[in-house]
Amino acid sequence: MSAGNGNATNGDGGFSFPKGPVMPKITTGAAKRGSGVCHDDSGPTVNATTIDELHSLQKKRSAPTTPINQNAAAAFAAVSEEERQKIQLQSISASLASLTRESGPKVVRGDPAEKKTDGSTTPAYAHGQHHSIFSPATGAVSDSSLKFTHVLYNLSPAELYEQAIKYEKGSFITSNGALATLSGAKTGRAPRDKRVVRDATTEDELWWGKGSPNIEMDEHTFMVNRERAVDYLNSLEKVFVNDQYLNWDPENRIKVRIVSARAYHSLFMHNMCIRPTQEELESFGTPDFTIYNAGQFPCNRYTHYMTSSTSVDLNLARREMVILGTQYAGEMKKGLFSVMHYLMPKRRILSLHSGCNMGKDGDVALFFGLSGTGKTTLSTDHNRYLIGDDEHCWTETGVSNIEGGCYAKCVDLSREKEPDIWNAIKFGTVLENVVFDEHTREVDYSDKSVTENTRAAYPIEFIPNAKIPCVGPHPTNVILLACDAFGVLPPVSKLNLAQTMYHFISGYTALVAGTEDGIKEPTATFSACFGAAFIMLHPTKYAAMLAEKMKSQGATGWLVNTGWSGGSYGVGNRIKLAYTRKIIDAIHSGSLLKANYKKTEIFGFEIPTEIEGIPSEILDPVNSWSDKKAHKDTLVKLGGLFKKNFEVFANHKIGVDGKLTEEILAAGPIF
């Protein structure tokens, strides 16, 4: 025997324990209760007997609400919560209906991955009917019609985060709390793949032909793509549905429904559209416009009018949009903007691609400008309220933001340059195609490995000085921004109505393009109404509405050059941002209206001779150029580019006698 460790071994290698004192039994108090069960009294216990029951206690069900409108409240009082949900699901099922079978899928609310806590196995569902004149009912049954489609309806950002992290590869929570996502192969819009149905109505109403962004398709091809998108969405186990609004003006808002397959798309639209209250959702009803986003599934290249596997299709008569072959979320935002460019003018409301802010005294300014002109920077002013950064309507009562969020560029973003955007990137924000550290999840905004078009989509409430609701009175100033790399446009010019229309239609800025030998020269670019890719009607129609509203409200037009002075790019210098801000401040305060003005040659601009805090020599470009002949030659060159661009609009008559067209043409460069 060996007892070196206090134990003993027997001869066959087994263990035996020494005789003697043993450890006392643990006393639990069980005997006092008359039971042999051991009880742990060390802490409180939960009111659950299973782990599923415990999980069900973690989430409190949202209490049913009553519509704010008293009449609606009376109507809903007799309708149970279950009946309201059934009506809601029937509407969604109808949206997802195949137009050949004329019946929608069996839809049920909730995530299919979550177990039901009531023990039921077959969820209550709704079936929706869709009556169409396109094709007769066939009564055909498909595999997708035999299964349930789970609808994740108007989920909160937290719920959408969970869905994205669980099921979408490439979705991560960054160190600042934002959701980083990838948009797949497409990291920007595909304007060449955008199509608009040309029918008896749009034939005469829309702008077609040279210079137009509207590329036609026929009704049949749209229906083929619609069926393809709907079949794809119905084949999925779950889809995301957002019911939201466009336009903060309550008299002219539009109800939109977005059906998508990705949490990324649902959160993006949650941020970009106006978010309804629970009361508004209960009485939402049938949407005015529906988007079917099947972007993960390609279109059929052999279908007529298709040029690639991507197709973004608008049918204004059906008020539907179909997305195939691109997961870039910006297609939804700009697709709806195009719809507003069609619907709002029918109500005599001007839709505008502009920024908008308001002073503490209620003075409103509109900012128009292409990429790189400073529209976002100048419209975001800590001394003024932000109404919106991109899309607006000008109604009979004032201005309103179309959207409920902002879609800001992130490339080279810094806290110092753009503090408002930097601070808005937090929990709830979608960060699109950014690069981040694999361990710390800190975003590197200077890294363009995925794309230069990195973006952040966040609710407008994330901006501290946002005006909620996003509406304001009639604008006092209409500011057209141009980054003139030719260096011949004045830092600021006061425009008459005809000049405002001419430069609004032109939509000018200049880009700096590099060449192989390192020489860089400016390239003029023009985009009608500062947003040609999104307008539906002829540009002159929007310009005429703008002039009419400016005239009736006494608004002043301004052209502000944020580009070069003292020479073209490579010779002159960029106009200091501090000078431009002083100009904008003088416009806001009204002091610039009181300045002394003189007229320039070629373009005939009215320019101030003096502005406090700005060197007088830069106010007239010719004074800042050392080579006067080079200035004149460059000025004539730019004037020629304006004339050439405007040729496509010259023959379009506005009004009965075309007199307005003549006034606009006369407001252009003369030499």
UniProtKB/Swiss-Prot annotation:
Tissue spec? Expressed in cotyledons, flowers, siliques, seeds, leaves, stems and roots. Localized in mid-veins.
Residues with PTM Phosphothreonine: 66
Activity regulation as described: Allosterically activated by calcium. It may represent the only case of a monomeric, allosteric enzyme.
Main EC class of this protein?
lyase
Q: Which UniProt keywords apply?
A: Acetylation, ATP-binding, Calcium, Cytoplasm, Decarboxylase, Gluconeogenesis, Lyase, Manganese, Metal-binding, Nucleotide-binding, Phosphoprotein
> What positions does the entry give for substrate binding?
189, 328, 334, 455
Q: Compositional bias (Basic and acidic residues) at which positions? A: 108-118
The annotated region (Disordered) lies at 1-44, 100-127
* Keyword Iron in record: no
Spell out the Pfam families in the cross-references.
PEPCK_ATP
Binding-site residues, ATP: 334, 353, 369-377, 418, 455, 574-575, 580
Q: Which residues bind Mn(2+)?
A: 334, 353, 390
Name the domain of life: Eukaryota
Please tell me where Ca(2+) binds in this chain.
270-271, 404
- What EC number(s) would the UniProt record show? 4.1.1.49
Q: Which residues carry this modification: N-acetylserine?
A: 2
User: What Gene3D superfamilies does this protein's entry cite?
Assistant: 3.90.228.20, Phosphoenolpyruvate Carboxykinase, domain 1, Phosphoenolpyruvate Carboxykinase, domain 2
Q: Which compartments does it reside in?
A: Cytoplasm
What pathway is it annotated to? Answer: Carbohydrate biosynthesis; gluconeogenesis
Please share the entry's free-text remark on the cofactor: Binds 1 Mn(2+) ion per subunit.
Q: Which residues form a coiled coil?
A: none
Q: Where is the composition biased (Low complexity)?
A: 1-10
Q: Name one GO cellular component term.
A: nucleolus
Record-linked CDD domains = PEPCK_ATP (cd00484)
Biological function: Involved in the gluconeogenesis. Catalyzes the conversion of oxaloacetate (OAA) to phosphoenolpyruvate (PEP) through direct phosphoryl transfer between the nucleoside triphosphate and OAA.
What's the protein name?
A: Phosphoenolpyruvate carboxykinase (ATP) 1
Q: Which organism is it from?
A: Arabidopsis thaliana
Gene responsible for this protein:
PCK1
